[in-house]
Amino acid sequence: MKTYLVGGAVRDGLLNLPVKDKDWVVVGASPQQMLDRGYQQVGRDFPVFLHPESHEEYALARTERKSGRGYTGFTCYSAPDVTLEQDLARRDLTINAIAQDAGGNYCDPYGGRADLQQRLLRHVSGAFNEDPLRVLRVARFAARFAHLNFRIADETLLLMQAMTHSGELHHLTPERVWKETELALQTPSPQVFFQVLRDCGALAVLFPELDNLYGVPAPAKWHPEIDTGVHALMALAMAARLSQEIDIRFATLFHDVGKALTPKVKWPSHHGHGPAGVPLVAALCERLRVPNALRDLALLVTEFHDLVHTIQCQPPTELVALFDRVDAWRKPQRVQQIALTSEADARGRTGFENNPYPQGDYLREAWRVVQSVSTKEVVDAGFKGMAVREELTRRRIAALDAWKQVQ
């Protein structure tokens, strides 16, 4: 019975990155032997155990054989005669197929350390194409390690393209697609995830709303990058610079989907694309079962981002109506979120990356002004019922009007 550290812990250690979770593989042991040593079994489909003290996961070495469609169609075989090399062979990428024993020695039968040095994401074997989820996982790793200059091996990208064209991605559940997307949105370069999906054809399958933006032009004066799909990923990259919140990143990515609905005869103008895109974002979020908080912000950003770009020209009545519409009184964080998504949109353009975005500060300051209006004073003045809301609105508009006079 031998125990090895495997997977991400070994990979990240070799990259001198922080090691968060440790996974172990046990060779030459049976489930009963693990139980006798105090381990707690938690795996149903294959034997995975929790260490009695560290509670880290220890999995018995196993092989996997394709027995059905999709990412769940596998039959696992786990027994004391399964070797470490056989267990590592079932893993997705060579950089994830490195093991380390208690003495610090590496078992690296598939060249993972060499690929780490070459900054290469390469599949272990042809069995890679048996699990369609791996297309998304590789895209996520590309996003996670883009800042270290990792790239996908040509042969791996070709395999991902073949997997997409085979229709296997249609067997992925919405929950798994969203989980990988959610993790990708947390990476330093989330735009790389979606670019890789486009490169292998998967974007059209999983995110057609985004894929449909490619080839849709915008006015060169305002969008030197011209292509709306390119702009969407540039805006996402800027959102990642401005905020760690995936709510902001997600909302920024899909803010322009309504432009795909513009008739070609009206190109490159896209008047009204914000409200037009709201049903598309709603359908996307329902299909992928996106959490409500992310969905709600994305819907608001899609509808109102153009209004925020012209916020300094808007009358006080429009500003108060905007704060009402986004429910800022109960969810004040939305003001900052909408300011940041709009800034990411504005700066996510070729040549605009380092420009200031005064509209964001204007929106925040306007919010500070309306917040200074006291609800208690309105109630104390004798207003009741709906009259309280009406008087609050009147006073907020008056406060903004006075503020705008001195701008």
From Swiss-Prot:
UniProt xrefs under InterPro entries: CCA_bact (IPR012006), HD_domain (IPR006674), NT_sf (IPR043519), PolA_pol_head_dom (IPR002646), PolyA_RNA-bd (IPR032828), tRNA_CCA-adding_enzyme (IPR050124)
Cite the HD domain residue spans from the record: 228-329
Which terms under GO biological process does the entry name? RNA repair; tRNA 3'-terminal CCA addition
One short Pfam family name for this protein? PolyA_pol_RNAbd
Q: What is its EC number?
A: 2.7.7.72, 3.1.3.-, 3.1.4.-
- Asked whether the keyword rRNA-binding is assigned, the reply is no
Q: Does the keyword Transit peptide apply?
A: no
Catalytic activity as recorded in UniProt:
a tRNA precursor + 2 CTP + ATP = a tRNA with a 3' CCA end + 3 diphosphate; a tRNA with a 3' CCA end + 2 CTP + ATP = a tRNA with a 3' CCACCA end + 3 diphosphate
User: Could you say which residues bind Mg(2+) here?
Assistant: D21, D23
Q: How is the cofactor bound?
A: Magnesium is required for nucleotidyltransferase activity.
What cofactor is needed? Mg(2+); Ni(2+)
Q: What does this protein do?
A: Catalyzes the addition and repair of the essential 3'-terminal CCA sequence in tRNAs without using a nucleic acid template. Adds these three nucleotides in the order of C, C, and A to the tRNA nucleotide-73, using CTP and ATP as substrates and producing inorganic pyrophosphate. tRNA 3'-terminal CCA addition is required both for tRNA processing and repair. Also involved in tRNA surveillance by mediating tandem CCA addition to generate a CCACCA at the 3' terminus of unstable tRNAs. While stable tRNAs receive only 3'-terminal CCA, unstable tRNAs are marked with CCACCA and rapidly degraded.
Q: What is known of its domains?
A: Comprises two domains: an N-terminal domain containing the nucleotidyltransferase activity and a C-terminal HD domain associated with both phosphodiesterase and phosphatase activities.
Q: What else is known?
A: A single active site specifically recognizes both ATP and CTP and is responsible for their addition.
Family per similarity comment: Belongs to the tRNA nucleotidyltransferase/poly(A) polymerase family. Bacterial CCA-adding enzyme type 1 subfamily.
Designated name of the protein = Multifunctional CCA protein
Whichever gene encodes this chain, its name is cca
